[in-house]
Swiss-Prot record:
Mitochondrial matrix side: 46-59
CDD domains, A to Z: CcO_II_C (cd13912)
Source organism per UniProt: Pan troglodytes (Chimpanzee)
Enzyme class: translocase
Record GO terms (molecular function): copper ion binding; cytochrome-c oxidase activity
Keywords: Copper, Electron transport, Magnesium, Membrane, Metal-binding, Mitochondrion, Mitochondrion inner membrane, Respiratory chain, Translocase, Transmembrane, Transmembrane helix, Transport
Positions of Cu cation A1 binding: 161, 196, 200, 207
InterPro entries per the UniProt record, alphabetical: CcO_II, CcO_II-like_C, CcO_II_C, Copper_CuA, Cupredoxin, Cyt_c_oxidase_su2, Cyt_c_oxidase_su2_TM_dom, Cyt_c_oxidase_su2_TM_sf
Compartments in which it is found: Mitochondrion inner membrane
GO cellular component: mitochondrial inner membrane; respiratory chain complex IV
Entry binding sites for Cu cation A2: 196, 198, 200, 204
Protein name: Cytochrome c oxidase subunit 2
Subunit details: Component of the cytochrome c oxidase (complex IV, CIV), a multisubunit enzyme composed of 14 subunits. The complex is composed of a catalytic core of 3 subunits MT-CO1, MT-CO2 and MT-CO3, encoded in the mitochondrial DNA, and 11 supernumerary subunits COX4I, COX5A, COX5B, COX6A, COX6B, COX6C, COX7A, COX7B, COX7C, COX8 and NDUFA4, which are encoded in the nuclear genome.
Amino acid sequence: MAHAAQVGLQDATSPIMEELIIFHDHALMIIFLICFLVLYALFLTLTTKLTNTSISDAQEMETVWTILPAIILVLIALPSLRILYMTDEVNDPSFTIKSIGHQWYWTYEYTDYGGLIFNSYMLPPLFLEPGDLRLLDVDNRVVLPVEAPVRMMITSQDVLHSWAVPTLGLKTDAIPGRLNQTTFTATRPGVYYGQCSEICGANHSFMPIVLELIPLKIFEMGPVFTL
């Protein structure tokens, strides 16, 4: 999860997020290289007194500055397309959960567990227990197993919302009248936080998402939902 004064991305809790972090570092190194080359060329231009105004044609130079950017774009596009394909891939999920966005709370349906349905509201400051996070904790957490593929069906009852959990690398829009889906496999237990990531009205900042990830054996033993 996030912590105070954090500069980088949150620690990965899913294979997709691990791939996103690697791609982020890969793209950032290319950007740093481009910035260095531009600054170096600018430095040479400002400090040298040598000029050449008689050049009317530079075929080699034009070839280089046409091919080199194309190669750089390919180096960025190929891993990006690979990750984009992975995010849309559905690999035989163990079970399915439906998430419905409202102004300003979430409803969850465990369709594979007897049609369990519950609402998840942000905890007001007066109801926070020691250790709870202000504006992030909820009254009913979503309990999920680790090391099991989960399919999340996401929609909205009223306006546009977005179901996002950064540590899992998830962000899927909740659109009225449309059912979107995303899949993920958590790799380690813990409590992870997300928020609605689409401006949806006055209380947009007050509809957090809390996932409690537990070992699969414990999840299969019986009721673990804190309702």
